[in-house]
Amino acid sequence: SGGPLLDSQGRMIGINTIIYSSSGTSSGVGFAVPVSTARRVVGDLINYGKVNRGVMMLSLVQNTSRIANYAGYGIKNGMIVSKVRKGSLAEAAGIRGGNTPVQYGRNTIYLGGDIITAIDGLPIATLADYYSALEDKVPGDTVKVQVYRNRKYLELEIKLETEGTSQNSSSI
């Protein structure tokens, strides 16, 4: 773990992180962080002391069949925008959060807002998809976000920002 992952030409293509092994030995399926991600993360750590990723200042909930049926959504995939931080660039771009509070497990979520279905053309079905689409984005980058609103698909351009930089950076 932590060593370089090399291709057949001896070029580093990743950093090994973990091995899944049923035998407990160093044989099995290995996982690695791509070298492009590692370079950016290391650069951010050196320059800023933290990873500097672009964010949209949203509170999201994964859409499920259960939620979609309850809320009467016409789709059963995507990420529901529960809340949008006041004063954020996402709010300025027109993305809408929900306005109907619903108890979901131990949390209150807000339904009726936009549902994010794609970012820069990449389908968004899960929170992992959402984070993957933003993985290499930095504050100041603009992304094209496809949302489902009132049974229609719309495309919004949202400029990403740094966590806590909105005019009102209180919690979402």
What does each model-found stretch correspond to?
Residues S21-S23, Y73-G74:
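Short, flexible turn/loop "capping" segments at secondary-structure junctions
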Residues S23-V29, V51-G54:
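Short loop-to-beta-strand junctions
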Residues N16-I19:
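Short beta->alpha transition motifs characteristic of CBS
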Residues G30-F31, S82:
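Glycine- and other small-residue-rich loops at beta-strand/loop junctions that grip anionic moieties
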Residues D7-S8, M12, T37-I172:
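C-terminal recognition in membrane/secretory proteostasis and scaffolding
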Residues G3-P4:
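A residue-level detector for well-ordered beta-strand positions
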